[in-house]
Amino acid sequence: MKRLILIIIVCCRALGWCHANTQTETDSLYRVAQSLPHDSTRLEMFKRLAQIEQLTPRCITFSGLLREEATLQKNDRYNTIAAYLHTVYYYNQNNRDSVKKWLDTMEPYARKSQTWDLYFDALRFQIDLCTYEEQYELAINEANLMYERAQKVNCARGLIGAKQCLGNVYISTERWDEGMKALEAAYQLSLQTDNAVVRISILCQLISITKDQKNNQLLSEYLAKLKETLHHHTSTNPMLKEAFYDVYLFCEVYYTYYYLYAGQPEQAHKNLVKAGKFLNGNTFFLYRVLYYDAYAAYFRACKAYDRALAKIDSTIILLQEDFNSNYIHQKLTKADLLAEAGRSAEAIPLYIETLHLKDSIETTVLDKQMQQIKAKYNIDKVALEEERLKSYIQLGTLIVVVIILIILVAFMLRIS
């Protein structure tokens, strides 16, 4: 579930901007906004409206109103925020081109207002979408460039985000040690800031890795840190608790795995029941996938194969629109369950079908990576040739200057 986790983590970053989403509240606040004077209170109200609606198309409407008002008031900071909210919406739609468009719009405003935190958060959305689309080489290159840019403007959030992006790529390509190293570096950097949402997102990434590696000791440590950070943040900001329901669900789901690995299925079931309490109409579908997947693991541990298969089928239905590695992983898990249940006649054709699909996707991914490497090589080669040409021009200019100086010296000597 590596690529699935990736999308969940970045959504976690956007949660700091989220509030309870009710149509009544939105309509009420919009009426208030229309009566406000053209000052910072009006800007704040449009920002809040866009935050509330960030998962719906109305986010674009309110972000657009915020942008118009910020332009009218010549406020670069709120223009940055308006562009950022556009990137949040389009990120949730997996629309990398639109994220890029609004990043380009955001940059000059971020530079003028020095709101680099938001800019680098949005840049991270773009890079993580590259990883989600399996453009790994591009994501690595962009993450390294992001780190360099963040260093130049001394932006801690940018440094953290770049390390997280690298961690995501390494997780997705099963380079576990490099992924852990990058994310640990990000976590240590996050301790130097007061941004709890950033720490929560990093801890979720570390939890996903330690779960995949079945390192129960580290899984327990990171879960405890996540629980503490989440509790402190929502206690300090009680209005945000509902906005963090998906993260609470995430925490309980991964406690389920901790207890399953520890051989305590009864306790694991208690955590699943707790997780279910955080499901609602606004639950992002990938969190539902995580929830059903954990339930399948629980039923599998109890050898209740029919119930486990039903849960796996639920995840396959949710993921079937995009035949990616998550979809394949779930199909293979279903084949494993059928085999364990003694239904080999059903398992074997499913193994064959899924492995063919896996080979096809891996070949496509490999081709993408090779094209990216070749493209980077050609770009680097062109840049090298340009540098060589510049060197030749500079050398030629220097030779001409030296010749002129020699002629001048000779002329002066002749005169004297």
Q: Can you say where each PLM-predicted feature lies in the sequence?
A:
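"A position-specific structural signal for the A-helix of alpha-solenoid helical repeats
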Residues: 48, 85, 118, 125, ...
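Structural signature of alpha-solenoid helical repeat scaffolds
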Residues: 37, 74, 114, 154, ...
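Amphipathic alpha-helical segments of tetratricopeptide repeats
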Residues: 31, 67-71, 104-111, 144-151, ...
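Hydrophobic positions within repeat-based interaction scaffolds
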Residues: 24-39, 60, 97, 306, ...
